[in-house]
């Protein structure tokens, strides 16, 4: 299948804190040559504004997305370069558009990544709700037996949320808490963000170079 014919990944961004995780996942997908269908929930726009100062607007989403993807996790603008060719592989769908392509099982998507996923999002998907396009697309992904990765960003977790996470696992989703590791020698907050984003891409089967992989003794010899 040519790159032009490759089916897109749906990326859903919920209202949980952690919009830098979503930006890193998006950069990783685009760097790997993937196409993206982006769904940014209403709640996530408020979080994005708080965390980055960027107001994501449907009418100016390309401009806002470019600024978002260029920004580092430390808030510094123009940390990353994203080409126009990469941005051209992103399609944006309004969160309230329940007639959008990703709302149908016949829409040819590879799968869906929800990054970050709030507990409200987890509950909605676990219960099969379709209050917006993000939840509907996730339900469709499950019923079509496609890959669904849910990067939960919350702590502590209630018993109710844990049960809902189990329900998602049993339905075929990959439940991936946004928990960074420290064995790769992280020195900046971006390293921790990229580790989580890399694990999301690992779960999706998308190659990347976002973090240094464990190869037995990353930090040198260790006594047992």
Regions from the PLM with identified roles:
Residues 1-148, 156-224:
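A cross-family phosphate/adenosyl-ligand binding-site feature
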